[in-house]
Amino acid sequence: MNRSDLLENPRTQTESGFLLIHKPVGMTSSDLVVTVRKKLGFKKVGHTGTLDRAASGLMILPIGSCTSFSSVFLEKEKSYEAWVKPGESTDSGDKEGEILESLSKEQTETWFQEHQEKLRNLFEQVPTWETQEAPEVSALKVNGRRRSDLFREGVALVPVVRKIKIYRYELGKFSPESISFQIRVSAGTYIRKIVMDISDRIGFPLRLEKLVRTSIGKLNLNQADSYESLLDGKIKIHPPETILDFPTVEVPDTEVRNVLNGRKIKLEWIPVNEFLLVSPEEEILAWCKKEEHGIHELDYKYLRVFPKN
């Protein structure tokens, strides 16, 4: 479906599904949402978690009624490829921030020759980390305001410490010019803060030079459309059943209307936790959740019903 088809097609305003887009460096997540609205004509577009302006990579954008599923992806594991610049540090931990310290090439190489084993050991210990203090320059809100804005104004911020988990980690290039690694982490983990913390522990300036998000849950960057494809209007709308991990329960034709009217029906089986009710044509009718300790055919609740247009 190209751009002209989308703009001329009356389904554009009611289409539901997901867009997988490779966000470029220099654009905020909100900028990408605005671009999708303008270029493709969708009124209802959301996103499933921010990606820093200085980073690129996979963004999942729900459209239409699928914006109801935005929160589902917030707790998914995420994978990244990171490149670190030795010899320079910023207040944000990436190249977008204000420079705090910058060493010459000669100073960096001299320090690296003397301390590289200690630095390598710190990088290799990353998989053992279990907590992380959120960076002061972040999109997290304090009384409705971004921490980064308050930090820039000189407001003292209360540390926000989170539990994190490193599922996979591989250290790659390791030289005075660049350090690289691949990592898969729990939701809410800041890769640039990992670099900032290593820098603080060893007393040597480091910052992220490049960061690419390569996956969110089961979805990979190689499935995403390029930003150029978005600008050309040549972008794929992924149906929800190919994106969501929820089990499905088929509803007979005789009960479809009851579900769409928000009336619970008896189910032959109820999956663990959350699930979708679908029609015989595999159209999503409702998003449901099993009641805690539920054992009967009605022991579930509707999280969202998707009425037909």
Swiss-Prot record:
Q: Which InterPro entries match?
A: PsdUridine_synth_cat_dom_sf (IPR020103), PsdUridine_synth_N (IPR002501), tRNA_psdUridine_synth_TruB (IPR014780)
Report the enzyme's class at the first EC level. isomerase
The catalytic activity of this protein is classed by the Enzyme Commission as: 5.4.99.25
- Superkingdom of this protein's organism: Bacteria
List the Gene Ontology MF annotations in alphabetical order.
pseudouridine synthase activity; RNA binding; tRNA pseudouridine(55) synthase activity
Q: Which UniProt keywords apply?
A: Isomerase, tRNA processing
Q: Where is the active site?
A: D52 (nucleophile)
Its UniProt entry gives the catalysed reaction(s) as: uridine(55) in tRNA = pseudouridine(55) in tRNA
SUPFAM superfamilies from the entry?
Answer: Pseudouridine synthase
One GO BP annotation of this record? mRNA pseudouridine synthesis
Role played: Responsible for synthesis of pseudouridine from uracil-55 in the psi GC loop of transfer RNAs.
Q: Which NCBIfam families match?
A: TruB
Family indicated by similarity: Belongs to the pseudouridine synthase TruB family. Type 1 subfamily.
Q: What is this protein called?
A: tRNA pseudouridine synthase B
Task: Name the source organism.
Answer: Leptospira interrogans serogroup Icterohaemorrhagiae serovar Lai (strain 56601)
Gene transcribed to yield this protein: truB
